């Protein structure tokens, strides 16, 4: 099993897909990485040579912010917004959707399970 930036890549998947297991790397970025390193995107992870693996590792570490560093940066950005008290920070603090979604209905993922109100009955 190939290991890049602390992530075990699945052996049987194509490199284009396998690289997306790294936090911060999607399909587009994966294709950019493979083009820059000259590795065929249809190559399976198990077929990579040690030389190609080293080249991939060096490229990712030198040019991209991924995994722990990226997670820390995102958390720091959220913390900063909360501290300065901007609208997005307030939404984060209250656990509500940040990007303008409706909250009268839906938004259950952000708000958590429904809280029942005692004494409230259905109007006829």
Swiss-Prot record:
InterPro entries: Rbsml_uS13_C, Ribosomal_uS13, Ribosomal_uS13-like_H2TH, Ribosomal_uS13_bac-type, Ribosomal_uS13_CS. One of its GO terms (molecular function) is tRNA binding. GO terms for biological process: translation. One of its GO terms (cellular component) is cytosol. Signal peptide: none annotated. Residues 95-124 are annotated as: Disordered. Keywords: Ribonucleoprotein, Ribosomal protein, RNA-binding, rRNA-binding, tRNA-binding. Part of the 30S ribosomal subunit. Forms a loose heterodimer with protein S19. Forms two bridges to the 50S subunit in the 70S ribosome. Belongs to the universal ribosomal protein uS13 family. Located at the top of the head of the 30S subunit, it contacts several helices of the 16S rRNA. In the 70S ribosome it contacts the 23S rRNA (bridge B1a) and protein L5 of the 50S subunit (bridge B1b), connecting the 2 subunits; these bridges are implicated in subunit movement. Contacts the tRNAs in the A and P-sites. This is Small ribosomal subunit protein uS13. The lineage of its organism: Bacteria, Bacillati, Actinomycetota, Actinomycetes, Mycobacteriales.
